[in-house]
A protein has these predicted regions:
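Sequence/structural signature of beta-propeller modules
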Residues: 19-140, 166-168, 528-532
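Repeated scaffold domains used in trafficking and secretory/extracellular systems
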Residues: 73-82, 119-131, 148-161, 203-213, ...
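Residue-level detector of Asp-centered blade-edge/turn motifs that repeat once per structural unit
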Residues: 84-87, 163-166, 214-217, 269-272, ...
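Structural motif
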Residues: 96-107, 175-185, 226-233, 281-288, ...
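Asp-box/WD-like beta-propeller blade repeats and closely related beta-sheet repeat scaffolds
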Residues: 133-158, 175-177, 182-215, 235-264
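Long, internal scaffold/assembly segments composed of regular secondary structure
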Residues: 267-379
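Loop/turn-rich, solvent-exposed surfaces of beta-rich toroidal or solenoidal domains
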Residues: 329, 381-489, 493
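Blade-level signature of beta-propeller repeat domains, shared across WD40, Kelch, NHL, RCC1
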Residues: 502-532
């Protein structure tokens, strides 16, 4: 196993012992009372939870350890509800054609709501596709099938969601429609899914919805691809709007289909009203005052440029680092061909802070290249947000090992989607960076070049002090568990073939520490024993 420890011994020792001292982001009381109420977990977007995860040992999972449900395609995440009056929890999840509720204990689908007018993808069609990719997920014919299968994602309209403390599930669509769904019987977790209310963004707020989050006083925050920000009261009776700085002409700045516009991803929120949004060339802090939105520096707002020679901007959702008395940052990867991990001072910049060499803005506190331990590496990009745990920031390599000569470079996403587990294409590399508060600088932590995470969003566990990713070995999908402090592989589970492709989904932990994630056609949970 090749793990490169890049930190000093003193820094490594500090990292090893910091788990017990980490400040977690505060719980938002208006979100579901669980560890995962929205994409990336909570408003801070860290992809880190407090509970333990699996602890091994390495094994090939038995069929009775794998719980799979057909949900239709593109269920990339699932929000965990709080406890209902009937004593149960459910998972809420949505995709191209439907919303589902899955029982927390049994993993059975207990309710479905199909989107009007959407093509319905049944299980027979799913099984045919899975069988084709199990037979062959490499070569020209497999790529043709991949084009066909990935083409249906163009119909994905409702990707960003938030689950409230009252079991209301908010869904933002690319048409600017925010819909609140709930239970036909609020006391029955298994009751039918019904539409409660709708809010349509005004026509002048153009662009698909590219993020949905909730402030710590319970207001929904929405961002559109063209740089408009909305604050909406959860009962949809009041709203405020603002446009980000430097967004003039954003309608003409997309570099591809939806998801390649001026704003490409979701955003983070802190408990003081700070909203952190990445646009094509800038990181923005917008202030929610409780009575409106502000981009005024006098209110604490700011805008800072980051490097973007690639031209498409960051592929990362901003993640917050540091709470309480800790140094506080917002973290992204930038738009360089060889991307950097970039830390911005979240609030005031220290008076004696000097602008870093090569950094385009004084607000940047740290900027290091993601080179996977190879100083000769010329290009690497990722579509995943930066996983943050304590002062650690972790990224994965999503650049395929090979791209067939007849495909343009822009088609690289295809190679890590339906073909992501194939040894010919699968990317390798996980890298961690660490903020050193004593030296006030960002440092390299470690690199593991033996682990492949083709397209999954990793998840860190505070209690286990591990990071989990859905990886691949020998064209089989796996769960990989790495020591957060050292990067060493602790164990792995072999899950199986193409039914269990992670396809850009989050690697999630439920309240009891069981791994679950989305697949091309459903959702799967690994029902293995978890140490308390």
């Amino acid at each position: 196993m090749r793990v490169i420890l890049l930190a000093s011994f003193a820094m490594l020792l500090s990292t090893l012992t910091q788990a017990q001292d980490i400040n977690m982001p505060p719980q938002n009381p208006y979100l579901a009372n669980s560890s995962y109420s929205m994409g990336h977990g909570n408003p801070s977007q860290q992809d880190a939870v407090s509970q333990s995860g699996p602890s091994g040992p390495s094994q090939t999972l038995r069929p009775d350890q794998i719980q799979y449900q057909h949900t239709g395609p593109a269920h990339f995440g699932a929000a965990t509800s709080g406890v209902y009056p009937d004593g149960k929890r459910v998972f809420w999840s949505n995709g191209i054609d439907r919303i589902v509720k899955i029982d927390y204990d049994s993993w059975e689908v207990v309710a479905e709501h199909f989107f009007p007018g959407a093509e319905v993808y049944d299980e027979e069609r799913a099984n045919e596709s899975i069988a084709e990719f199990n037979a062959n997920n490499s070569g020209v014919f497999a790529l043709a099938r991949t084009f066909r299968e990935m083409g249906k994602l163009r119909d994905l309209s409702n990707i960003y969601t938030v689950l409230g403390q009252d079991h209301i599930y908010y869904v933002g669509s690319k048409t600017g429609l925010i819909t609140a769904y709930g239970d036909a019987d609020p006391n029955d977790s298994h009751s039918a899914i019904i539409k409660k209310a709708e809010f349509q963004l005004p026509p002048e707020l153009t662009g698909p919805v590219m993020g949905l989050n909730m402030t710590y006083d319970g207001w929904l925050i929405v961002a559109t691809e063209h740089g408009y920000i909305a604050a909406i009261k959860p009962d949809f009776t009041e709203s405020y709007f603002i446009r980000l700085q430097f967004s003039d002409g954003a309608e003409e700045k997309e570099t591809g289909a939806t998801g390649r516009g001026w704003i490409r991803n979701g955003f983070a929120i802190d408990d003081d009203g700070g909203i952190y949004i990445a646009s094509q060339d800038h990181m923005h802090k917008v202030i929610w005052t409780g009575e409106g939105l502000s981009v005024d520096a006098k209110e604490g707002a700011w805008t800072a440029r980051y490097l973007n020679s690639w031209g498409e901007g960051t592929g990362a959702t901003p993640s917050l680092m540091g709470f309480g008395e800790e140094d506080q940052f917002v973290v992204i990867t930038d738009g360089e061909d060889l991307m950097n991990v970039v830390l911005f001072w979240r609030n005031g910049i220290p008076e004696d802070w000097k602008q870093l060499q090569g950094a385009p803005d004084r607000r940047i506190a740290g900027m290091l290249p993601v080179d996977m331990g190879d100083p000769e590496l010329a290009a690497l990009q990722s579509e995943q947000s930066v996983v943050v745990k304590g002062y650690g920031a972790l990224v994965v390599n999503n650049t395929p090992r090979n791209i067939p000569w007849y495909l343009p470079e822009q088609a690289s996403t295809l190679m890590i989607s339906m073909a992501g587990s194939h040894p010919e294409y699968q990317p390798y590399g996980v890298q961690q960076f660490v903020w050193n508060p004593a030296r006030q600088r960002l440092e390299n932590g470690w690199v593991n070049t033996d682990i492949s995470s083709p397209s999954s969003v990793p998840m860190a566990s505070m209690k286990s002090d591990r990071v989990y990713v859905i990886g691949a070995r020998d064209n089989q999908w796996t769960l990989e568990a790495l020591d957060w402090a050292t990067g060493e592989s602790e164990f792995y589970y072999v899950i199986g073939g193409q039914r269990y492709n992670v396809l850009f989904s989050g690697t999630l932990l439920d309240e009891d520490g069981r791994i679950h994630y989305g697949t091309p056609w459903g959702r799967v949970r690994l029902n293995t024993k978890i140490e308390p």
